[in-house]
């Protein structure tokens, strides 16, 4: 009876450890990816609302240096109105001290056309910005 109790205790501890470790891993990954997801959501919310100037302000500095707000608004207006979108994947990495990410977004346009986009982001001064 004592052996069975010890075995059950060990099994229980292992299960709790695996569950706890899994939860900790989930929270760590979530903490790393949520800011990139949130920045992408804010960007696509602005695009969906037709707020192209607001979406432009969410772009990284490199992109804003090479593309004027007027040109960006013209390009996005010509691309068609976004009816909806779903974020289907988030990947974040740090290389040589520079943190970047890619968020995969399935975009649906008015009229039903769909396209999957790999949205590149960079972290600038503690903020995530779309850089494409």
Region roles according to the model:
Residues 13-15, 60-62, 129-131:
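Functionally engaged cysteine thiol sites
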Residues 7, 52, 120-123:
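Secretory-pathway extracellular proteins and peptide precursors enriched for disulfide-bonded cysteines
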Residues 10-11, 56, 127:
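Secretory pathway export signals and precursors
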Residues 31-36, 44-48, 64-67, 109-113, ...:
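Extracytoplasmic/periplasmic, Sec-exported soluble proteins
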Residues 2-45:
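Short, low-complexity N-terminal intrinsically disordered segments enriched in polar/charged residues
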Residues 93-132:
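Exposed beta-sheet edge and beta->alpha loop/turn motif
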Residues 42-45, 52-100:
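Short solvent-exposed beta->alpha transition segments
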